[in-house]
From Swiss-Prot:
Gene Ontology cellular-component annotations: cytosol
EC number(s) from the headed UniProt entry: 2.7.4.9
Any one GO MF annotation of this record: ATP binding
Family per similarity comment: Belongs to the thymidylate kinase family.
Lineage, top ranks: Bacteria, Bacillati, Cyanobacteriota, Cyanophyceae, Synechococcales
Species: Synechococcus sp. (strain RCC307)
Protein name (Swiss-Prot/TrEMBL): Thymidylate kinase
Residues reported in the UniProt entry to bind ATP: G10, I11, D12, G13, C14, G15, K16, T17
Domain of life: Bacteria
Amino acid sequence: MRGRFLVLEGIDGCGKTTQLKALADWLPASGLMPSGAQLITTREPGGTALGQALRQLLLHPPEEQAPATRAELLLYAADRAQHVQTRLEPALAAGDWVLSDRYCGSTAAYQGYGRGLDLDLITQLEQLATAGLQPDLCLWLELSPELAAQRRSGQQQDRIEAEGLAFLARVHQGFAELSQRPLWRRVDASLPPEQVHQQVQHLVREGLELAL
């Protein structure tokens, strides 16, 4: 039986890392996963050895080597193509479950809505990079850009996080539009982490039990 593929999306500061860990702790004991299935947690960019190198280029390049906008898009696509072909597809084909911090939604939101690149072009690159692999469920941890910026105040920022509030607002709007798609669910990430996790549990159980 093919495994299930779950994705957490959201702007920087929304609490994805915390919720990914909580979900990874809960899922194996939830009764949703078949006996013998393993749970794999991963991220984009950086879910493979090649992806780690690309992540460094994308998020922490020397100033004079920062990728231009279209180059940035292509580097994210390369990271995803490697991730899908060498890690996601083999795991799912083996019956394992995959939980990913970011996937295609982030590219549409950040490079499409945030950077202003053509969404049709991004969709074409997505189809090439993923070979059609779509998540079974995508959870958008929705948090206002202002609150996200407050949460990250004083923390070291990577190149994307340092883009500023106006950029973050465009990305947030992108996620809001993407969340209207089938298999996307909105989570109120402004609540305390325990309450956010309760929402995540409910939405995962509801979404996957319908598909099982």
